Curated annotation (Swiss-Prot):
GO terms for biological process: BMP signaling pathway; floor plate development; lens development in camera-type eye; negative regulation of apoptotic process; negative regulation of DNA-templated transcription; negative regulation of transcription by RNA polymerase II; neural crest formation; prechordal plate formation. Transcription repression requires formation of a complex with a corepressor protein of the Groucho/TLE family. Binds DNA in the form of a heterodimer with the bHLH protein hey1/hrt1. Interacts (via Orange domain) with id3 (via HLH domain). Interacts with the bHLH protein hes6; this interaction may inhibit the transcriptional repressor activity. This is Transcription factor HES-4-A. Shows a complex and dynamic expression pattern in developing embryos. In neurulae, expressed in the presumptive floor plate, the anterior part of the prechordal plate and in the anterior neural border. In tailbud embryos, expressed in various neuroectoderm derivatives and in the mesoderm, where expression is limited to the presomitic mesoderm (PSM) and pronephros. In the PSM, expressed in an anterior stripe prior to the formation of each somite. Expression in the presumptive neural crest is disputed. A motif (WRPW motif) lies at residues 278-281. Its main location: nucleus. Transcriptional repressor. Binds DNA on N-box motifs: 5'-CACNAG-3'. Plays a role in the patterning of tissue boundaries. Promotes floor plate development and prechordal plate development. Required for lens development as early as the stage of lens field formation, partly through regulation of gene expression of the cell cycle inhibitor cdknx/p27(xic1). A role in neural crest development is disputed. The gene is hes4-a. It comes from Xenopus laevis.
Length: 281
């Protein structure tokens, strides 16, 4: 083959390829860049939570205040929060009043705590040099006035559902001393023994009487003193006289003034009254 017809060497396609054909991997994002990219998403979620909670709070506060939700459909967020704060303060006052009524010791604890706080404020104002004298005087005067109002507070006890029963304790004197007791009529159907040894006995005419052991006669076999449910009972003749509850008598030895008290109208003798009495045993 002649030399002029020889093929010229050609460049290889692989060798002629660019050198930057290989792609480099992406660099990982830093923590600050991640926070910046996720901040709008987190802000959107936070606002959604706030709006949802305010919507639920609006429904609850309108139901608690018994207001029509259709008339308050466009309440602002500030209005909802203000209504909630006022409602919670009212609930706190009611709970405090109920606690003071049911437990009087709570008022004493509150007074002690308020007095301690007043002393701390007084001590701080007396040692602090940057407080104006006028402001210090006004503040201490206000706290002293509030403390005086708290000390003067008197909470009335709730009225008792029990019905008062007036009974009399017979003695040697002609005018017995009335005693006021609290007895629930629903619980006085049958004889009951209470703490202290006294017994409540219902009579046949619907009245009640107490049997209280007399400590002056401890040597005798258990004498008791009857107490009368009604101090004055109108006799058939129209005059008023002391009338005992039927069926009451003394145990053991009889006493002279007790024998007179057992007589229904004061005209019968002690023997007649002893025969006509009703003995519960």
């Amino acid at each position: 083959m002649p030399a002029d017809t020889m093929e010229k060497p050609t460049a290889s396609p692989i060798a002629g390829a660019p050198a930057n054909s290989a792609q480099t991997p992406d660099k990982p994002k830093s923590a600050s860049e991640h926070r910046k990219s996720s901040k709008p998403i987190m802000e959107k979620r936070r606002r959604a939570r706030i709006n949802e909670s305010l919507g639920q709070l609006k429904t609850l506060i309108l139901d608690a205040l018994k207001k029509d939700s259709s008339r308050h459909s466009k309440l602002e967020k500030a209005d909802i929060l203000e209504m909630t704060v006022k409602h919670l303060r009212n609930l706190q006052r009611v709970q405090m009043t109920a606690a003071l009524t049911s437990d009087p010791s709570v008022l004493g604890k509150y007074r002690a705590g308020f007095n301690e706080c007043t002393n701390e404020v007084t001590r701080f104002l007396s040692t602090c040099e940057g407080v104006n004298t006028e402001v210090r005087t006004r503040l201490l005067g206000h706290l002293s006035s509030c403390l005086g109002q708290i000390v003067a507070m008197n909470y009335q006890q709730p009225p008792s559902s029990q019905q008062p029963l007036h009974v009399q304790l017979p003695s040697s004197t002609p005018a017995p001393m009335p005693i006021s007791c609290k007895v629930n009529p629903a619980e006085a159907i049958s004889p009951k023994v209470f703490q202290g040894g006294f017994q409540l006995v219902p009579a046949t005419d619907g009245q009640f009487a107490f049997l209280i052991p007399n400590p002056a006669y401890t040597s005798s076999p258990g004498p008791v003193i009857p107490l009368y449910a009604n101090a004055n009972v109108t006799s058939p003749g129209g005059r008023q006289s002391q009338s005992p509850v039927q069926g009451l008598t003394t145990f053991g030895h009889k006493m002279p003034h007790m024998a007179q008290a057992v007589s229904p109208l004061g005209g019968s003798t002690g023997a007649d009254s002893a025969e006509s009495v009703w003995r519960p045993w």
